[in-house]
Amino acid sequence: MASSTDVRPKITLACEVCKHRNYITKKNRRNDPDRLEIKKFCPNCGTHQPHKESR
C-alpha cells in the first residue's frame, strides 16, 4: 500500500488553458519538491500547452 511519504508519488497534469486533466505521471519528490510544469499536447485544445501538476 502506498504511503503519503512515497518518494515517487503519482501526479496528475492539468492543462493551463482548458483545465482538463490529461496526463498521469510519477515524479521524484527529492529532485522536484515544487509543482511540476511541462509543455505537452492537449487533445482538448488541439495544440501544445503548458500542463501543471494538480492535486
Swiss-Prot record:
Quote one Gene Ontology molecular function term. Answer: structural constituent of ribosome
- Keyword Ribosomal protein in record: yes
* UniProt-listed InterPro entries: Ribosomal_bL33, Ribosomal_bL33_CS, Ribosomal_bL33_sf, Ribosomal_zn-bd
Q: Name one GO cellular component term.
A: cytoplasm
Q: Which SUPFAM superfamilies match?
A: Zn-binding ribosomal proteins
The answer on whether this UniProt entry bears the keyword Ribonucleoprotein reads yes
GO biological process terms on file: translation
Which Gene3D superfamilies would you find in this protein's record? Ribosomal protein L33
Which terms are listed as keywords in the entry?
Answer: Ribonucleoprotein, Ribosomal protein
Q: Which HAMAP family match?
A: Ribosomal_bL33
Q: Which NCBIfam families match?
A: PRK00504.1 (NF001764), PRK00595.1 (NF001860), rpmG_bact (TIGR01023)
Sequence similarity? Belongs to the bacterial ribosomal protein bL33 family.
For this entry, the protein name equals Large ribosomal subunit protein bL33A
Q: Which organism is it from?
A: Mycolicibacterium smegmatis (strain ATCC 700084 / mc(2)155) (Mycobacterium smegmatis)
